[in-house]
From Swiss-Prot:
Assigned keywords, A-Z: Acetylation, Cytoplasm, Lyase, Metal-binding, Zinc
UniProt-recorded name of the protein: Carbonic anhydrase 1
Family, per entry: Belongs to the alpha-carbonic anhydrase family.
PANTHER family: CARBONIC ANHYDRASE (PTHR18952), CARBONIC ANHYDRASE 1 (PTHR18952:SF282)
Region ranges (Disordered): 1-31, 241-261
Domain Alpha-carbonic anhydrase: 4-261
Cleavable signal peptide: none
GO terms of molecular function: arylesterase activity; carbonate dehydratase activity; cyanamide hydratase activity; hydro-lyase activity; zinc ion binding
Organism in which the protein naturally occurs: Homo sapiens (Human)
Active site positions: 65 (proton donor/acceptor)
Binding, Zn(2+) 1: 95, 97, 120
Amino acid sequence: MASPDWGYDDKNGPEQWSKLYPIANGNNQSPVDIKTSETKHDTSLKPISVSYNPATAKEIINVGHSFHVNFEDNDNRSVLKGGPFSDSYRLFQFHFHWGSTNEHGSEHTVDGVKYSAELHVAHWNSAKYSSLAEAASKADGLAVIGVLMKVGEANPKLQKVLDALQAIKTKGKRAPFTNFDPSTLLPSSLDFWTYPGSLTHPPLYESVTWIICKESISVSSEQLAQFRSLLSNVEGDNAVPMQHNNRPTQPLKGRTVRASF
């Protein structure tokens, strides 16, 4: 089977993406390093409010470079509000990024510090657009909550997700994943940084308002190993474990990172 036109190895990885996706060198690319001394406290930022209905959880899919947990997004049962937003954004997915070792794996970094993994909870602007497809490339189309994951204690809240990975070992496999509220994965404090950015993998649309939580969540070494044991090949092909899927940080290019705290 033909390999996708992008991935995370030397031949098709982040250094090569700009050949096919010139926006890779754009002015609003993600992830970034958050330099805390250069962030700007903004009193106009409201608290983040998430209201997710567990009944909207739908399925888990191995997409070859990661796995996605997808949600029903035909109505506003699961939404993100507040923060920098005047519109409500509808939940459609969460996924993770990780590295080949526990020393790195997050996409965003804080004062240069790399975390072991990163959770992304993704939403689209259902107040202005009629579908994810329509919203995905628009400047105000997407809102993603990023949560840094620090290696340490096992995180019991991840267990249902990890238990589901057995059923989606290889690329293209999918399985039902129901009755789950991803707000249970968020840290207890929703203090956040926010900045205008992009999807962190192709097509790299500069359509994401990022909400990066100040507080991290825990993940154990064994739990990270379960992420890496997923395979990026289709069933029957040689086993190629998903060792890493994190893009390096991109230059801020004059953007301001605002802080809610």
